[in-house]
Amino acid sequence: MTKSELIESLASKNPSLPIKMVEHCVKELLEQLTATLEEGERIEVRGFGSFSLHYRQPRLGRNPKTGESVLLGAKYVPHFKAGKDLKERVDLL
C-alpha cells in the first residue's frame, strides 16, 4: 500500500472528513515519526510495534560495477519491530 492508497482508504472510511485533511494528517504523522527518529528517540505504538534506530558498524563493501573495495562508514538505520497483536493478526493469513 502506498501513501496515496492509504490516504484514499482512510478518506473512504471517514466520508465526513475532507480528503485534504486526511492527507494532511497522514503527512503530519509521518513527519512526526521521522522527526522523533532523527532525535534518536524510540517510538512505541502498543499492539502495533516500535520504531528505533540500529547502529551499523563501518565495513568494507564492494562496488558491483568495478569490483573495487569501498569503505562504508558507520551509520544509523531505522528498524521496526512488530508488536504481539500485529504478529498474531498477520499470522492468521
UniProtKB/Swiss-Prot annotation:
GO MF term set: DNA binding; structural constituent of chromatin
Subunit structure: Heterodimer of an alpha and a beta chain.
InterPro entries on file: Hist_DNA-bd (IPR000119), Histone-like_DNA-bd_CS (IPR020816), IHF-like_DNA-bd_dom_sf (IPR010992), IHF_beta (IPR005685)
Database matches in Gene3D superfamilies: IHF-like DNA-binding proteins
Lineage: Bacteria, Pseudomonadati, Pseudomonadota, Gammaproteobacteria, Pasteurellales
Known role: This protein is one of the two subunits of integration host factor, a specific DNA-binding protein that functions in genetic recombination as well as in transcriptional and translational control.
Cellular component GO terms held in the UniProt record: chromosome; cytosol
Keyword hit for Transcription: yes
Keywords assigned: DNA recombination, DNA-binding, Transcription, Transcription regulation, Translation regulation
Any single GO BP term: regulation of DNA-templated transcription
PANTHER family for this protein: DNA-BINDING PROTEIN HU (PTHR33175), INTEGRATION HOST FACTOR SUBUNIT BETA (PTHR33175:SF5)
Keyword Hydrolase: no
Family according to the record: Belongs to the bacterial histone-like protein family.
Protein encoded by which gene: ihfB
This protein's name: Integration host factor subunit beta
